[in-house]
Amino acid sequence: MAVNLSRNGPALQEAYVRVVTEKSPTDWALFTYEGNSNDIRVAGTGEGGLEELVEELNSGKVMYAFCRVKDPNSGLPKFVLINWTGEGVNDVRKGACANHVSTMANFLKGAHVTINARAEEDVEPECIMEKVAKASGANYSFHKESTSFQDVGPQAPVGSVYQKTNAISEIKRVGKDNFWAKAEKEEENRRLEEKRRAEEERQRLEEERRERELQEAARREQRYQEQHRSAGAPSPSSRTGEPEQEAVSRTRQEWESAGQQAPHPREIFKQKERAMSTTSVTSSQPGKLRSPFLQKQLTQPETSYGREPTAPVSRPAAGVCEEPAPSTLSSAQTEEEPTYEVPPEQDTLYEEPPLVQQQGAGSEHIDNYMQSQGFSGQGLCARALYDYQAADDTEISFDPENLITGIEVIDEGWWRGYGPDGHFGMFPANYVELIE
């Protein structure tokens, strides 16, 4: 609702005119509302300036003050309009009276400075006069005679800003700068040295770990050969172990001579295994294979030497060369009968593949190693000596002291079993020890 200035219009106009009249002793007027209505009335006038006006402000009301002050720069009269909203006024009243500010500014026109105040700190006389001085725009004064030229006698010589250079202080300043520069350089060198030592230590530990793995593999091979020599049996490792060790050593020397880091022994083993699988497939006779079912049967013994789990192939006894192979083939056919059905008349079209005999040597080598160690290859448990992280999903990860169950010995250097998380996969044999 709009503010009402007509009800007490003559009194309001008289108070305003008395303030703006320069020769009038009245220098301030205070206006407020009549109760909770929007009618404006004169709350009071005075001649005491800002100090007296501030004392009349009520913290529980909305009031409008109009005051005449003297500009400290020019000495001319200036008018100040104060929109006072006390801290005790409720929010509804504050919102309603906020729309009346522009109407009151139009009525009390001619104000040079307008101040919106809520607390006593906002209406301190010093603060108001400072705002009036800033609003004048220039520091000048009227009605003041300028001082005429006066002969004050001879003036003193103009002082110089030159300062004599102090060699000692200059040396100290330069020395201080050099000291901090040297300290920063030493700190940088120290950090670089620590980084270099850490890198050397890491490389040394990595080299020791690789050497330890190679030594453990060599000791395991040597122990395997000694056990076979003590038992009087021919050592298969004399035919397979030494070429494998020589291949690993030769690959390691090639990498070191090329200036590169030697690969992990497991990677060398994988490369050797892939090469053996390729050679075995090439040496077979694909011209005699006319059935996909028989081709699958012939490739199953090939994968038994690798990492995939397959049924164990029976080994021929001493002095027997050709008899056990058909029994192995027939047993494989018996296991596959629910899925594949081979006509009887096709049996005469296939000959006994030499691939089974070629892979028999590898299986015999693994079985001899298993028998020499005193375990059957399945249902074993082992405790982890070192931590190992799986390189892919066919391997398992474990930490020291973890138990690995259901171990299957598929190779001298790689076994399979269930890890701590229940995942079944391969792991290096020299990272664990069997539990009796």
UniProtKB/Swiss-Prot annotation:
Result after altering Y350F: Reduces phosphorylation. Impairs podosome rosette formation. Abolishes phosphorylation
Composition bias of kind Basic and acidic residues appears in 185-229, 264-275
SUPFAM superfamilies from the UniProt entry: Actin depolymerizing proteins, SH3-domain
Q: Where in the cell is it found?
A: Cytoplasm, Cytoskeleton; Cell projection, Lamellipodium; Cell projection, Ruffle; Cytoplasm, Cell cortex
Specify residue ranges for compositional bias: Polar residues: 276-286, 294-303
Coiled coil ranges (UniProt) are 179-233
**For site (Cleavage), what residue positions does UniProt give?**
D367, N368
Gene3D superfamilies xref list: Severin, SH3 Domains
Where mainly found?
A: cytoplasm
How would you summarize the oligomeric state and partners of this protein?
A: Interacts with SHANK3, SYN1 and PRAM1. Interacts with SHANK2. Interacts with FGD1, DNM1 and MAP4K1. Interacts with ANKRD54. Interacts with COBL. Interacts with WASL and WIPF1.
Q: What does the comment on domains in this protein's record state? A: The SH3 domain mediates interaction with SHANK2, SHANK3 and PRAM1.
Name assigned to this protein = Drebrin-like protein
What is the organism field in this record? Answer: Mus musculus (Mouse)
